[in-house]
From Swiss-Prot:
Entry keyword annotation includes Cell inner membrane: no
Protein name: Small ribosomal subunit protein uS10
Keyword Protein biosynthesis: no
GO CC annotation: ribonucleoprotein complex; ribosome
SMART domains named in the record: Ribosomal_S10
HAMAP family: Ribosomal_uS10
SUPFAM superfamilies: Ribosomal protein S10
Keywords: Ribonucleoprotein, Ribosomal protein
Pfam (any one): Ribosomal_S10
Organism: Leptospira biflexa serovar Patoc (strain Patoc 1 / ATCC 23582 / Paris)
Classification via InterPro entries: Ribosomal_uS10, Ribosomal_uS10_CS, Ribosomal_uS10_dom, Ribosomal_uS10_dom_sf
Family (UniProt): Belongs to the universal ribosomal protein uS10 family.
Amino acid sequence: MAGQRIRVKLKAFDHRLIDQSTFEIVATAKRTGATVSGPIPLPTKKEIYTVLRSPHVNKKAREQFEMRTHKRLIDILNTNEDTVEALMKLQLPAGVSVDIKS
């Protein structure tokens, strides 16, 4: 396992949660002796939904809602067994999606 690269992708709707999670992952990886590249902010996906305010008339009256998905990328280099074990035991907030590839 020594010398491999782990790529961690994070997704969340709240930018504060994702920043806190990236800080915890980077600190854990550095504490175990791995080299960390990142966090790299990826483009934010913005989905906009437009709906009518009234159920029957007033076509001009509309309301818009948006959903932003924030993404971050972290590359962890020169990993060892301690790094992988520490990352698996890490408790992250519920609103953060983590995708780990080696």
